[in-house]
């Protein structure tokens, strides 16, 4: 059993014998049920550094969204010397470390695909290195090349026609969360020792190919851990041993995360669940008289400042899918322990308080793990932050904890994963709205007129028959589920082979559980379309080739989002049916299939590729985001809409059910206190029904319109809104995406 001097004052034994951060937390954290009166404002150092960073962000926006771009150096753990927000003020930074050598400079990351790395440069006027082009086209294969080498013609056709779309075949998959707390608690040498033991454990007689691969992966992980020490040494720190105090704990932990974002540009690069862990160090330092509350808040502010600075070089097609430059540096606060104790500490308040000390921001993607049993003071403080900043999302700890335990992280937008025990294979989305049109048209794409799906007999009747449509749709979903999973299997095989996340996996157990994430787009449109076919009369309008291109729906029909079981039962049926089909497919590395109802801002792109639907949505119009009801469908107010979404069973969509709601301030109350109390009551009722997720926006449509028309106004520089699964600065969205946000329902009544 190890017993480092840095652990003096900490309780427990089990976490010293084996890597078990959860046990360390359980034995040492201090729950807090008081109010927010202890919080401190920003220090002079915070104001100076944040002021400088805001100047750089303004310059970045003026240059078209990119301040600087690397073209000559391949990003890696030891690719750069030290970098600071401002060299002349580096002594002010209590947490140091940049992705490159300059703030907001975007790294060159070719392992996912050289073409994408180069296009990201040329899009913004930078000329990529000819030498690196030669290396990564002649001598070093990339993930992207590997995937396209083995794609079948059917996969290429489905991808091109966007019935499966947003696939991580041209960008890093992300969604793997290293347990960055391990660097602080154990030091890197101890982690290397444990990985070396695992490496030797797999040296046995009669080894198979899977053993060979695992040994190679562990060797890569050990190499990454050694390079982590070199990276930290550049900044003057020795992370070989555990952190001795809160300052070192924050710095060590951040170095672990920095290693991840120096080596991977995944669509989601989550931070994980760190607040309670760091609070333990802070409480010990308070007792020792070596830390003040002002210093503790400064430490959190500076750490969050670093998360706000994370940048990746992206191509235009990526930005269309994930608009506003998100990185999903998702960071969780609150939740309950399996022993019933609240996990809320003073540090959970401090992380939310950064939105007051430094203003609203999309990153980190602050996520409250919500339960009606959380301390009332904390619930009210979190709700107040939502009312004033619209920067926080909420996820139901009561439905996630029984599945993932009480030490899980959110690995992207809304998806849970056990910290340090699991990884998730990210799978983008299947367009179930387009699949419905394929069922009607016998596999012919309604836009391109190409035979994409199986050439089943199309529906030829003038009016759609519900039973016939359901039978054809069931068959077409069979085809889509199999093709979708096969495509993802290829992607993840090649990502492991050519763009392996060694630095992150080094901070995760070797014997890891894997989940296989999929996703659904067009959910509410399918539900409403099926409802229209069942309860109204839907006449098919066909073109000269006999392809259904529009629909004339006559009569009324129940719509999802109004707490009407006739529509809501169809929503449950759809989710259950598609998940059942996915679960029958073979998944890579024995991963466990899950699905999500989540679209990000890609609902606009998906909508462009999708024809008119029986629910009344027309060709090219955006799809409704996530599990949200269709635009204009909600007629009975906010609570009815929430009730409909809450009926979707989380166990059928363990990858998450995203629900984004915008509420007019006047609908919530006359002042912030009344709005805060009412929002807490709404969330208590919503989550107690078993609902999974809620994005909360509190503003009116008129503010969005003014921000769109006058982005130069100072008050809109950091105007942050919640969209499906993340937050974004509104003025960073494209005009088209801004119009989509404005078109969404803003509830004027409860």
Language-model regions, residue ranges each:
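Conserved catalytic cores of very large enzyme subunits
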Residues: 2-750
